[in-house]
Amino acid sequence: MTPQELTVAAVQLESQASLDDNLEAVTRLSRRAATSGAELVVLPENFAYMGSEEDKRELAEPVLVEASPSDGPILCALRALARDTGAFIIGGGMPERSADPERPFNTSVLVAPDGRVTASYRKIHLFDVSVGDGQLYRESASTSAGERSVVGDVRGVPVGLTVCYDLRFPELFRKLADGGARVATVPAAFTLMTGKDHWHVLLRARAIESQMFVVAAAQCGRHPRGRMTYGKSCVIDPWGDVIAQASDGPGFVLRALDLGRVDAVRESLPCLTHRRPIG
């Protein structure tokens, strides 16, 4: 039987180019969230590192289910955090080794309280844009794209995994809903330019279209090389309402999700079952 409530936390960070400092912030805020009752803690994209792409490549690790001597510092930290807190941890957007050593995957990992990686999702949609903020984004030059959608399990609740720019592709969220997801997670590092106009609109749209909760953990503030991110980590319900939002700056937002709300919305407005083939 699917649980009817899940308490989630979306952690907001201002990650920099120091792996050690970033992991210290991750550990500190995640512990606070778990102590406050979070059963699932979602970290933002690039939670471990927001420096140069060249250095990020050097941090790429294999992602294995069980703890292994090949684990790098990022996955070791996530496993330890999950074990110590008893919470599930989603590390959204860490560099995972790929067949191309110059282009690791941007991978969201779901780590269970026993330290095992029970699901991992490789970001499909890569951020190749120019949005007028003085930065040129070409994620595909340094990152390999994933190919498959992933729904993990958190205490019996199906949870869909995405990363940042995936938010702009509604078909992925519908795929997650079709795969049973009742919650979608969006670890992100939205730019200040796009975030102020699109962040809440897109999150609410994805929640409304797929009739599930959306938990969005964001980077905020200033980062190396002049990059600025929007923040506003939040939780959206299946009706599209913003039911929790972080304040400015690093921290976290906590919310107990009434999963019966998913059933109620899907029964009252059965869009997912009303779909028809379009020629």
Tell what function each PLM region has.
Residues 67-90, 158, 164-253:
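CN hydrolase (nitrilase-like) catalytic-core segments centered on the catalytic cysteine
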Residues 1-8, 151-160, 183:
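Beta-strand-turn-beta hairpins that frame and shape the catalytic cleft
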Residues 67, 80, 99-179, 192-201, ...:
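Active-site catalytic loop in hydrolytic enzyme cores
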Residues 19, 27-114, 120-122, 191-206:
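Cys-nucleophile CN-hydrolase/nitrilase-fold catalytic domain and related Cys-dependent amidase chemistry
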Residues 12-14, 44, 122, 218:
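Residue-level recognition of beta-strand->loop/alpha-helix junctions
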Residues 91-93, 106-110, 150-152, 233-235, ...:
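Short beta-strand scaffold segments in enzyme catalytic cores
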Residues 1-40, 185:
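N-terminal active-site segment of His-dependent metallophosphoesterases
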